[in-house]
Amino acid sequence: MVLGGCPVSYLLLCGQAALLLGNLLLLHCVSRSHSQNATAEPELTSAGAAQPEGPGGAASWEYGDPHSPVILCSYLPDEFIECEDPVDHVGNATASQELGYGCLKFGGQAYSDVEHTSVQCHALDGIECASPRTFLRENKPCIKYTGHYFITTLLYSFFLGCFGVDRFCLGHTGTAVGKLLTLGGLGIWWFVDLILLITGGLMPSDGSNWCTVY
């Protein structure tokens, strides 16, 4: 069929091509406008404040609205933060008072014997929370672990205690040499150290606690 000197099929084909080209141009304009809006305008918080970038690419929010889903970084659970080791003041009470936190001594057998202090913590990268991202987390025990295991030390004391191996491992070098020279105090010192280990009277010399075996 011919319409105005042109076949109808040719006109339909030209119309479809024009519609396809128009759709492509429209999609290109929409996607370009969306990408410009996403990069040019900063995301706003629920309170209307801009959201700057924090360290590690994490968003640093300002806490203002108590009904906002964004919480303070200091309220994050332990699995979302990383904390430093407690500060060791090595018995210097003046330094502890000036800093406001830290441990004068480490270790202890009972809960009441262990000091507790605050430590510096920060939110992990990628976790969105209201600043400040670095804060103090309280009630951390003054305990450290340096690789001493109770079972291993007890076996050393039982089988090699006459040669002072148990005290050498715990860092009590002076008494270990005396125990070695006297062959465990003719067996008396060997037996006494076994009792001290079991009752908690003989611990590592650096004030650390026994490592826990899970």
UniProtKB/Swiss-Prot annotation:
It comes from the Eukaryota. The chain crosses the membrane at residues 145-165, 183-203. Keywords: Glycoprotein, Membrane, Signal, Transmembrane, Transmembrane helix. Residues 166-182 are cytoplasmic. Residues 36-144, 204-214 are extracellular. Residues 1-35 form the signal peptide. Residues 40-59 are annotated as: Disordered. InterPro entries: TM2, TM2D1-3-like. Glycans are attached at residues 37, 92. It is found in: Membrane. It is a multi-pass membrane protein. Belongs to the TM2 family. This is TM2 domain-containing protein 2. It comes from Homo sapiens. The lineage of its organism: Eukaryota, Metazoa, Chordata, Craniata, Vertebrata.
